[in-house]
């Protein structure tokens, strides 16, 4: 699989990444929110041992041994969740070298296994998750009920325990406010759309996460195919909206795109929300072939690297808010200059 952030493949039109997440629990332990720190760390050791023969592939990060800032950088890279950080005294995660796989331990469930790849490639992500899940299940007993399927802390994950999602760029549907209808429609068919950091996260930069909401009574194939059908419809709506807006407001759109690029290339201070909004207009310009000398790879990298914790890690310094804005503007200018 290809890491969506750093891939040089330029085929990720509208859909930036695809993710498959499996929720699993061990049969001989209670759920993470009820276990002690000692029990939680025992679970971490138990899962580590299963993958010890795969040491060349995976690295273990124990949150209680990590600097708080480093924890947040992995959140900003979509490798862990805010819930795992809250469980930092007994939480850990395992990832591979190219960071396309992340196995969270003691988040809401004992295991939250996720595989992320670039573009609209849900089947590829599922194959990756399935292979690692099979390896773990060969060595550990999962909590499983013949009628309900995989047992999970939250009832919405019962059954396959599978959550399929895509990160999708919908600037035009946001501009014409059609996105509100999509929000409403998805809820009615058991899907959800939210910010890119999942439940409770704010939508910024016109980037959304679309995923299934229920798993009970559905096979893995049905969950994936249902989501694919919905995402194809959203993609078509976004493309039609782009065609329409270019016919009616061509110069206004071009002005927004080039104005955004101009600000990014010259700003002295940039806050993260403004930066993501401007990057969205530039991405739209690239996707619509208005801008030809900026790569999607650079835009993807900037989407992550301009985040508050990432900026501080890149410059290896604890920064004030104004200092972060200054370094963010500096980083953006440098990356765009080298983008051609």
UniProtKB/Swiss-Prot annotation:
One of its GO terms (biological process) is phosphocreatine biosynthetic process. GO terms for cellular component: extracellular space. Keywords: ATP-binding, Kinase, Nucleotide-binding, Transferase. It is an enzyme of class 2 (transferase). Gene3D superfamilies: Glutamine synthetase/guanido kinase, catalytic domain. GO terms for molecular function: ATP binding; creatine kinase activity; protein kinase activity. Disulfide bonds: none annotated. Its EC number is 2.7.14.1. Belongs to the ATP:guanido phosphotransferase family. It catalyses: L-arginyl-[protein] + ATP = N(omega)-phospho-L-arginyl-[protein] + ADP + H(+). PANTHER family: ARGININE KINASE 1-RELATED, ARGININE OR CREATINE KINASE. This is Protein-arginine kinase. It comes from Clostridium tetani (strain Massachusetts / E88). Catalyzes the specific phosphorylation of arginine residues in proteins.
């Amino acid at each position: 699989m290809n890491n969506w952030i750093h891939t040089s493949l330029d085929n990720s039109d509208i859909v930036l990444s695809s993710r498959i997440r499996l929720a699993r629990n061990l049969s001989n332990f209670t759920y993470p929110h009820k276990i002690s720190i000692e029990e939680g760390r025992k679970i971490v050791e138990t899962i580590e041992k299963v993958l010890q023969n795969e040491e060349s592939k995976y690295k273990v990060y124990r949150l209680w041994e990590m600097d708080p800032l480093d924890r947040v950088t992995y959140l900003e890279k979509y490798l862990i969740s805010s819930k795992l950080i809250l469980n930092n005294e007994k939480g850990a995660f395992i990832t591979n070298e190219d960071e396309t796989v992340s196995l969270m331990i003691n988040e809401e469930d004992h295991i939250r296994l996720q595989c992320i790849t670039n573009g609209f490639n849900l089947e590829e992500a599922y194959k990756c998750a399935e292979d690692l899940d099979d390896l773990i299940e060969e060595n550990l007993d999962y909590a499983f009920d013949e009628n309900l399927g995989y047992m999970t802390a939250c009832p919405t994950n019962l059954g396959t325990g599978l959550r399929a999602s895509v990160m999708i760029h919908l600037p035009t549907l946001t501009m014409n406010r059609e996105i509100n209808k999509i929000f409403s429609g998805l809820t009615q068919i058991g899907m959800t759309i939210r910010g890119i950091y999942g439940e409770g996260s704010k939508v910024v930069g016109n980037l959304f996460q679309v995923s299934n909401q229920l798993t009970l009574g559905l096979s893995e194939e049905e969950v994936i195919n249902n989501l694919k059908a919905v995402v194809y419809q959203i993609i078509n709506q976004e493309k039609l909206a782009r065609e329409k807006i270019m016919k009616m407001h061509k110069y206004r759109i071009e002005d927004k795109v080039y104005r955004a690029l101009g600000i990014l290339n010259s700003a002295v201070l940039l806050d993260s929300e403004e930066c993501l909004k401007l990057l969205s207009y530039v991405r739209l310009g690239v996707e619509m072939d208005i801008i030809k000398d900026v790569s999607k790879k650079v835009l993807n990298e900037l989407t992550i690297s301009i985040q508050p914790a990432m900026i501080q890690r890149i410059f290896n310094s604890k920064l004030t808010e104004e200092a972060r804005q200054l370094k963010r503007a500096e980083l953006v200018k440098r990356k765009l200059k080298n983008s051609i």
